[in-house]
Amino acid sequence: MYIYMNIEKIFSIALKTWPIGNSFAINTNILETNLINLGVVLAILVYFGKGILSNLLENRKQNILSTIRDAEQCYQEAAAKLKQAKLRLEQAKLKADEIRIQGLAQLEREKLELIKAADEDSKRLEESKNVTIRFEQQRAIEQVRQQVSRLALERALETLNNSLNPDLQARIIDNHIGLLRTIEGVTES
């Protein structure tokens, strides 16, 4: 900024002091053209402006280097965070696969247990059905036996009542009494 202002002052002074002519020509007179003055002014500008310009450039260089260092540090931190995030992602994927495999294994175990329980229930029901059928068969057979026995007794009584006369009844009673006496005699001895 300082240099720019100095150059501007120099040109404004030069324009005020040098008349602008209608034609263009090269003046070779060193004193008239103020080449010495211009050389001195340029030398002063270079001498004093060099320090200012080099300071400005050095400051700019330091700012740029600092910005680059900060950017590199941010990049390294971001790269480290990215690496950690990728590692966590891989761990999460492994854990998800492990959970999925465990879930499938658990599902298969439960499926087998349900099939086994259903088979056992089916066997128990089949056995219960067979027991019930056997029980009902036994009961039906027993009922048939009882009915057959009752009918046989009824027919026997009917036959006895029809064929029994008082003489036959007396002989049967005497026969049974004789049998009882024989049994008593055997048991007493």
Swiss-Prot record:
Q: Whose protein is this, by species?
A: Chaetosphaeridium globosum (Charophycean green alga)
Bilayer topology annotation: Single-pass membrane protein
Q: Which domain of life is it from?
A: Eukaryota
This protein's GO CC annotations: chloroplast thylakoid membrane; proton-transporting ATP synthase complex
Kindly state the subunit structure of this protein.
F-type ATPases have 2 components, F(1) - the catalytic core - and F(0) - the membrane proton channel. F(1) has five subunits: alpha(3), beta(3), gamma(1), delta(1), epsilon(1). F(0) has four main subunits: a(1), b(1), b'(1) and c(10-14). The alpha and beta chains form an alternating ring which encloses part of the gamma chain. F(1) is attached to F(0) by a central stalk formed by the gamma and epsilon chains, while a peripheral stalk is formed by the delta, b and b' chains.
Q: From the Swiss-Prot or TrEMBL record, state where the protein is found.
A: Plastid, Chloroplast thylakoid membrane
InterPro entries, sorted: ATP_synth_b/b'su_bac/chlpt
Family from the record: Belongs to the ATPase B chain family.
Q: This chain belongs to which protein, by name?
A: ATP synthase subunit b, chloroplastic
Question: Tell me, what does this protein do in biology?
Answer: F(1)F(0) ATP synthase produces ATP from ADP in the presence of a proton or sodium gradient. F-type ATPases consist of two structural domains, F(1) containing the extramembraneous catalytic core and F(0) containing the membrane proton channel, linked together by a central stalk and a peripheral stalk. During catalysis, ATP synthesis in the catalytic domain of F(1) is coupled via a rotary mechanism of the central stalk subunits to proton translocation. Component of the F(0) channel, it forms part of the peripheral stalk, linking F(1) to F(0).
- Alphabetical list of Pfam families matching this protein: ATP-synt_B (PF00430)
Write out the GO MF terms: proton-transporting ATP synthase activity, rotational mechanism
| Further remarks about this protein from its record | In plastids the F-type ATPase is also known as CF(1)CF(0).
- Keyword entries, A-Z: ATP synthesis, CF(0), Chloroplast, Hydrogen ion transport, Ion transport, Membrane, Plastid, Thylakoid, Transmembrane, Transmembrane helix, Transport
Is Cytoplasm given among the entry's keywords?
A: no
Q: Which PANTHER family match?
A: ATP SYNTHASE SUBUNIT B, CHLOROPLASTIC
Q: Which residues cross the membrane?
A: 35-57
